[in-house]
Curated annotation (Swiss-Prot):
Its main location: cytoplasm. It is found in: Cytoplasm. This is NAD kinase. PANTHER family: NAD KINASE. It catalyses: NAD(+) + ATP = ADP + NADP(+) + H(+). The gene is nadK. Pfam families: NAD_kinase, NAD_kinase_C. It comes from Shigella boydii serotype 4 (strain Sb227). The keyword Acyltransferase does not apply. Keywords: ATP-binding, Cytoplasm, Kinase, NAD, NADP, Nucleotide-binding, Transferase. One of its GO terms (cellular component) is cytoplasm. InterPro entries: ATP-NAD_kinase_N, ATP-NAD_kinase_PpnK-typ_C, NAD/diacylglycerol_kinase_sf, NADK. The keyword Nucleotide-binding applies. NCBIfam families: PRK01231.1, PRK03378.1. NAD(+) binds at residues 73-74, 147-148, 158, 175, 177, 188-193, 247.
Amino acid sequence: MNNHFKCIGIVGHPRHPTALTTHEMLYRWLCKKGYEVIVEQQIAHELQLKNVKTGTLAEIGQLADLAVVVGGDGNMLGAARTLARYDIKVIGINRGNLGFLTDLDPDNAQQQLADVLEGHYISEKRFLLEAQVCQQDCQKRISTAINEVVLHPGKVAHMIEFEVYIDEIFAFSQRSDGLIISTPTGSTAYSLSAGGPILTPSLDAITLVPMFPHTLSARPLVINSSSTIRLRFSHRRNDLEISCDSQIALPIQEGEDVLIRRCDYHLNLIHPKDYSYFNTLSTKLGWSKKLF
């Protein structure tokens, strides 16, 4: 064992139970190598592990040096929103479909992770968005997002009329099905499907991407990540929501605004030493191949 990482957390709830074999393999391999291992409580229960140290995501964030997320991008997003609050590095083993954020191949995870544990890795700081639904002099409802915050109707699809203010200065108004506010990390997710630009992860920028705007002039807008975005609504309705990473929904009540800004903390995401962002674009999203 080396001094780069001493305590390692195993997290992630895969969609298919067969993927739990990766969790068990990882646990036994790390224990054999002499690491202190904390297993997320639900995983330990499903694997029926005996005499194992377990913890919540928050406890793993407090106690571990590295969290290994086993699953797909959804598992990574769910875990990362909590783990980003703590001084812990995060890496993923892909047991999902796309695996854009989970780099390690499950068939070669031991060798790749062994190199990482020896200190051979690339580190990135990925910022999050904080979304607040609030009314003056009322309690705020707050959530965070790694990928994006999306304004959309609740149950029935319909046009929304809203205004966008950036740093409290009017930017534009719009009639559309909604708005995607994306981080660089999320620029290859829902935002990409809606025609938004790809932002490399190191950019300090936020994109605003209209969803089916009822105009020929609406275009995606890229702003500095230090800006605060305020959404105001012309016709007060009780059926609007914002979604964070398509996992958490906050309803918007009559008279409420939505504030979106960069979080004060960030996710410490790490990759294998041979990681290339543009190679990932090519292999995962079919980005243009070399001609010569």
